[in-house]
Amino acid sequence: MSGFLAGLECTRCSSYYEGESPRAVCECGATLLARYDLAGIRKAVTPGDIARRPPTMWRYRELLPVRDDASIVTMGEGFTPMIPVPKAAREVGVGELWVKDEGTNPTGTFKARGAAASISRWKELGITRFAQPTVGSGGHAWAAYGARAGVEIHTALPVSCPDLGWKGSLINGAHVYRVDGTVGDVFRLMGEAAARHGWLLAGAGREPYRFEGKKTMGLEIVEQMGWQVPDAILYPTGGGVGIIGMWKGFDELQELGWIGGERPRLVSVQVEGGAIVKAFHEGADECVGARHVDTIAPGIMVVKPFSDHVALRALRATRGWAVGVPDAESLATMKWMNSREGLFMSPEGAATVAAVRRMVREGQLGPASRVVVFNTATGLRYPHLMDGPVPVVPGDGAIDDAAVAQAARARG
């Protein structure tokens, strides 16, 4: 396969670079997005062809940036389940609700998609040393795919992040740095280190190919819904890469003639006071003045996303919305979804369900709405949030009424 990647286009100044350019960002410093020979793809493949392919994100390989199939670094990522949650739908007040469960990906998160696409393409271009600032799950995914590809990964994260993030990266062979500071400090330090040591800085939005991996989430939703779109997609948003990727993917599907002009409303879900939420409701074109807050959901707390201008553009182009969710609501919803629907969601994923409830109260969604929310990681990555006063029964004792009552209290 020769691939259909045509080039890279700047999201700010519209500069264009040929497809074999090793650029990560535009000369002006802004985000680049991949562009494809869509006319060629239209002649080469149909939705029927895709349906017969293996259930991974690479079933859409014509819409991915790798030139040669032999360059693909994969562990079977993508084509994650769309799980209907009818009890939750009734209780939050929408007609239909699905959870796109990204926790089934390798390393347990949606980050596998971006890592697979980016490392595959960059290695194809001869780039083999990467700097990956993270809050945990991204670094783990890049470490795992880096190990599989045989490339060098350097990852840094705040010391406040759960241990699983850095320990997973370490066991996969990455160089790991824990930073006693904020996410902003991590990005600054890794940017400086990348320039000093000659690493490619692969943070969210700072290279074009992660968008392409994340784009496949939207392609899958459309295919799994019979080449239709839902009314709204609620997405846990940190750097905005997934929002941007899906928006881009829907435009490509329309140009291919595989869907019409309708679009789902893209909804950014962040912690309360999140940068994109603040900018969206203030009518701003980029994020200014947001502050770091400690949170149980670090994946949706980024003070100044690199691609904020593109994420905000995507929300407004789709008549979208932005919702901030307090930690207490995310944690309560995490436990509620476990007990009602059996889904062990991450706090970031649970925040999207809480956001649906808020949007119903505000009149943004209603009883006829068909809604998809994202669980971006398995809740198993957050065992520290599931502590509870469960009874300890002596081996020679009994599970008596008091123990049963304590167990009931522990489950909430």
Model-derived regions, located:
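PLP-dependent amino-acid enzyme catalytic core
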Residues: 1-412
